[in-house]
Swiss-Prot record:
This is Protein EFR3. SUPFAM superfamilies: ARM repeat. The gene is EFR3. InterPro entries: ARM-type_fold (IPR016024), EFR3 (IPR039786), EFR3_HEAT-like_rpt (IPR049150). Signal peptide: none annotated. Residues 478-510, 571-636, 891-927, 955-1011 are annotated as: Disordered.
Amino acid sequence: MGCIPCRTLQPEVAHLNACYPPPKALLTAGPEYRPLAQDLSKLTYFATNKPSKLAKIGEELEKRVAQESARASSGNHKYRASLLISLAILRALLTECKRDIALFARSTLRVIDSSLDVRVYQRGGIDLEVVGRAAAAFIAYTTYTDGSAVGVDDTLTKTYFEILRKFGSMATVSLLDSSEKPDTEQQNRTRLIALAGLNGAATSDAIFASTRDFPRQIDLIIPPLLVNTFEGQISELKLESAKIGMDASPSPFFSEFAAKGPVAQRRAPSLHAHIPGEKGPTSADVVSAALRSLHSLLQQCNVTQASQIIDRLVMFLDKHGWQYAERDCFVAEQVTAWIPLQYRFIVPTRLVEVLMDLQDRTPTPKHTSALAMVTTILNSTTSLVGLGVTDLLQHLVSLIIRRIHFDLRDALLPSLVQCVSSLGTHIYYADQINDIVEELALRIAEIPSSDTARSEIIRVLTCCISGVMIMTDAADNDAESKQGNNVPQPTPSTPGSPTPPNKGKLPAPAETPFLTPLFEYLRPQAHRSSRRNPISPEVWQETLPLLCEADYSVRSTYARALILFLETEMQRGPTPRTTPASGGSGSETATPNREKGVSFKVTEPTPGETATQTQSGSGATTPPKRNSRSHRPSLPLNRLQSYTHLSSFDNVATPLDFAAALRILDAMHMVVPVAALVTGAPMLLAVDRDAGNELVRRPGDGRAGAWVLERKRAIRELVSLVWRRIADRWGIVEIDDLANKALASLPEPYLIPPYPVPDSPPVFLSLPEEPVSFIQHTLEGESSSTAKPLLDQDTLLDALVKSQTVQAAKQMDEAGLKRLFDGKWSVEQAIKDSMERFSSANLRPDDDSHYNAASALLMSMNNASYQSVNGQRLSRTIDVTDLRDALGGRVDTVSTSGAPSIASFDDSFHSQSAPRSSLQSRRMNKDSDVKEILKDIFKDKKKGTKAPKGIVVNRVKSASASEEARTSTGDENGLGMSGMTQGDGATGHKVVTNPPLDLSLGRPVDVSSSS
C-alpha cells in the first residue's frame, strides 16, 4: 500500500486561515465580525518574527478579499462576513508589523481598493460597514508608512491615488435627491468615513514624500474638504473653528490619535459606521471633520506647498463662481491662521497676484471676493510675519491706477482703498507706516501731467494715505487698551486742546467758522504707540504740494488727510500757559534740547540778512536729536495765480479752500504752537500785506473770473481769525482786540464757511467733493485804503515781541523776536528754511572759508558721527563699511539725484536736485584692495587706543597765523567764528560758545577726491 503524499499548507497561510471562524459560524459572528483572537495573535507573532512571510500573507489576503468583495456585492452574507473579518485581520497586521509595512504595502492598498467597491445588494448604495473597516485599514497604513514608495512604485502609486479618488467621491456624496425620503444621517455617516480616510492621507508622511506627486494628492484631497466646508452655515464654521483653536487634537473625530512622532509610538484609530441606538452625526460634525483635516494639512506645509494649496482654493472658487463672499473671507482668514507663522504671507500675496492677473473689465464676483479676502486677512488678528508690505502696496497701487484708467468711477476702487488702508493694521517694523506714506507719495509724483485721469488717481491715492492713518490709529488704540494703557480722554480745558474763543474777555463777535473747536477732544499727545514710529514730517512734506492742485477734489481730499496727520501723527510741542500774575503773558516753557556737535537751524525761517547775527540768548534751540529722513524741496505743482481766463472757478481758491486752510492753521497752532508761531506769524503778515497789493481788480481788466476781490476778503478773514486764535493761545490781549476789531470791520456774512464735518464712521473713498464758488462782487473799483494791510502790522509785532509768554517759549529777548518775526517772507524762502541745510556726509556750503574752519574744529572733537568733511584734505577713519565696499558686498542704492518728488522742478530752485538721503555712506574706490583696507582698520584701531581721553585741544588752521587755539567739548550750539562767548563746559572748564551758524544750502561733496 503506497503512502499518501503530504499536502499541508504553508505556515503563514495556515495561520491566516485559522483566524476565520468555521464557515457555519460566520453568520453568527456578527455584529462585531472579528477574527478569532487567539489565532490572530499567533498570526501577528509569526509575521513579526518572520517579516519575509508578510508578502505571502498579503498576497493570500488579496486573493480572498477579491473573491469576497465580488460575492458580497451579489448578496452572499457569508462572504460579506468573511470580508469584514479579512479587513480586521489586515488592520491588525498593519498595526503590529508597522516597521515592515513596505513588504506588503502593494497588497494592502489593493485589498482596500477592492473593499471600497462593495455595494449593498439590490440597493446599490455604499456598504458603510465594509467601507468603514477599509477606511480604518487605510488610516493604519497612512499612519505608519513613510511614504517612500509613493511616486516610486507606479503600481502602488496608481492604487493609492485611486483610493483617494474614491474617498473624495464618497466625501461629497449627496443622498438628499436620490430618494423621496432623504436620509441625512446616512449621508453624514458616509461623508465622515470618507473624510476620515482623507484625513489619514493629509496627515501621512506619504503626502510630503514626493514633491512631484504632492500637487496630484492635494488635487484629490482639497476639493472634498472645501465642498464640505462651504456647505456649512457661517455660524457652524465659526463655532467649529473656535473649537479647533481650543482643542489641539489633529483628528477630525477622535482624540486617541497621535499624528506624528516615532512610528512605534503612533496609534491608528478604529472606525465604525453606526452603533444601534446611537444618534446619527449632524452636519456640524461633517464641517468639523473637514476643517480639522484642512487644519492638519496646512500645519505641516512649507511655503511652496502652501502656495499650491492656495492655488487649489482659487481653482475651487473659480469652479463654484465665487458666490459666497462671506464664507470666502472666513476660509481665507482661517487658512492663513493655520499655515505656519513664517509662511502666512503667501496667502495675501498670492491673492493679490490673482487680482493682478484679472483683465480690466466690469468687476465680477471674483474681483470683489478676492479683494475682500485680502482685506479680511490684513485686518484679522493673525500676524503675517515676513509680509512684503511695500511690494504688496505697489501691486495694489498699480491695480488702482489700472482700474481708474478703465473707469474713473470703478466700483472696485472703494474696496481697493480699504485694502490699502488695512496695511496699517499690523506693524511689522518701526518705519512701516512711514514707508507706506512715502511709497504713495512717490507713486503720486510719478503720475505724468499728460495723464487724463491724473486728478482722480491723486485723489484716490490720497484717500489711501488717510485710510492708512485711520486704520493705524485705531489699531494703536486697540493695542494700548489690550496692554492696559488706556488713555483718559481730555476735556476741552486740558492743555493742548482748543479753548472756547473770547472766554471772559470781550463780547463775542459775529459768528465765525471757529465757533466749534477743531478737535472736540484733542489728545495731549498724538502718537503714543510703542509699536511704531510716527509718520515723519520729512516724509509728509513730500505731499504738501497737493494743497495747491488745480482740481478742487484733490485739494479737499488732501486737506482732510493733512488735518488727520496733524491730529494723529504730529508730535505735540510745548504748550504755552498763561499765569494770572503776569496778566496772561506767562508760559510754561520746556527745557530746550541740545545736542553735541554741529547744530542746524532747521526749525525756523530765515527772516532776513541779519539772521545769522543774533545775540546770545536769542538764538534758536536745537531740535532733539533723532534719526530723521532728509528733506527734499517740494514747491507746489500748480501754484494758483490770478489768471485772466480760468477753465473753472475752482482753479483758484474757493470758500471751502479757505475753510480748510483755516482749520489747518488752527490745528498747527494747537499741536505745535511755538513752531507754528515762529513760522506762521511772518507768513500771516506777508499774506495780509500782499493781498492788498496783488489781488486788485481794476475796471475793464478782465479778471472778474479770477475772484480777485472775493479772495482778498477771504484772506483777510482768515488772517484775522488766525491772529485771534494766536492771541487766545498765547494770552496776548492786544492782538485779540486788534483781530476782533478787524473782523468787526468786515461786512457780514463771512465768506469763509464752516468746515464740513467728516463722515462718521469714516468712509475710505467717497465721491469727489463739489466746490462752492464765491458770490460775485459787484464793485468794479476799489479805494486806495484796500491796498493796505487790514491789521496794523506794527502794533501786531509790538504786542507779539513784548509778550513774556512768547519770550519765555523762544528764550529770546524783545530784539531777537523782532528780527525773527519782522523779516521778508516768501514761499521759496519758507521752503528752503523747512529743509536741512546740508547733509553732514554729502553736502558742503558754498562759503568754503567758514566751512573749512568749521570742519577742522569738528574733526578735532570726539564726534565720529560727522563723516568725511571735505575741508583741508582731512583724513578719515577707515571702518567696516569700507571693507564691505571692497569685498563688493554692499549695494549702494542711494542716488544723488534722488527719487522723483511731487514738487515741480520747473522753478530755478529745483535746478539742483537734492540728495535722496542725508545719511549717504562714504564710497571707496571700487578697486580697493581688501588687505589694504584691513591694514587701515587695524592701524586706526591702534591709534584709537593711544588717543588721550577727555577734552581735545586742536589749533584751527586759517589765514591768520596768530589765531589762538580754542578748546571744545562738543557741547556748543553752533560753529560761528564770530561773536563767541565763554561759558562753563560739562567738566567745569571755560569753553567757547557762539550763536548758531546759519550755513547756506550746500553742494555735494566729491567724497572720492577728498579721501
